[in-house]
Amino acid sequence: MAVIKMKPTSPGMRGMVKISRDHLHKGEPYAPLLEPQFQHSGRNNNGHITVRHKGGGHKHHYRVVDFKRNKDAIPAKVERIEYDPNRTAHIALICYADGERAYIIAPRGLEVGATILSGSEAPIRVGNTLPIRNIPVGSTIHCIEMQIGKGAQIARSAGTSATLLAREGTYAQVRMRSGEVRKIHIECRATIGEVANEEHSLRRLGKAGVKRWMGIRPTVRGVVMNPVDHPHGGGEGKTGEGRHPVDPWGNLTKGYRTRNNKRTQVMIVSRRKK
């Protein structure tokens, strides 16, 4: 995979850095695994904005990705690696020996034509999915379940992974990229390797219009609003917040921790690094 630095032929192209997709499939996606994706632009059923800064963007279909990988002991062949507009990671189209096809998150190093396997008997090889109890300590893993059979929820973005640190009884300790160490049941599944497209972090959009293509609208600072619109608003001339930073509804922000989930607090061995 290569990084493409665009020539400064216009202000928008100056500084733009793209990620090469020459190795990806250039045709249409696999139609039976597509679903329509409707745009709500951050509005609820009353038309009121419930999520700001959303709207517009390019239309695209949703690719149904298999996060459970529960088709055990049936080998699958990688047919192609594809671009997915819904996520930063690339996806791989696999074909099982019985003819069924599925999309999975493409791990780094997975090649077209490779054979992958799921289940407790699968070998320790990139792309194979196993219960954590069967994965050697120290392995690099991704697409990790948090609840047995629910499907992968952790380490699904481009270039991400986690490390299996230890196993104690029915739980294993897994260190995330953030530095957080979390306990996960050993019957939960994980996939060997790290997610592909690790150069995604080097991408530079170059211009505001690219954000609009992604369906992201501008974020206006509170200090330039009127007092009726934001607690930071108002004042004669250029002024600061005049208080601790808050959101439009007066809740503390910028470093204020809002996590309040006592039910899963016991699963966190050490908090993430700032």
From Swiss-Prot:
Belongs to the universal ribosomal protein uL2 family. The keyword Transmembrane does not apply. The gene is rplB. HAMAP family: Ribosomal_uL2_B. This is Large ribosomal subunit protein uL2. Residues 224-256 are annotated as: Disordered. Residues 229-246 have a biased composition (Basic and acidic residues). One of the primary rRNA binding proteins. Required for association of the 30S and 50S subunits to form the 70S ribosome, for tRNA binding and peptide bond formation. It has been suggested to have peptidyltransferase activity; this is somewhat controversial. Makes several contacts with the 16S rRNA in the 70S ribosome. Pfam families: Ribosomal_L2, Ribosomal_L2_C. It comes from Polaromonas naphthalenivorans (strain CJ2). Keywords: Ribonucleoprotein, Ribosomal protein, RNA-binding, rRNA-binding. GO terms for cellular component: large ribosomal subunit. Part of the 50S ribosomal subunit. Forms a bridge to the 30S subunit in the 70S ribosome. PANTHER family: LARGE RIBOSOMAL SUBUNIT PROTEIN UL2M, RIBOSOMAL PROTEIN L2. One of its GO terms (biological process) is cytoplasmic translation. GO terms for molecular function: rRNA binding; structural constituent of ribosome; transferase activity.
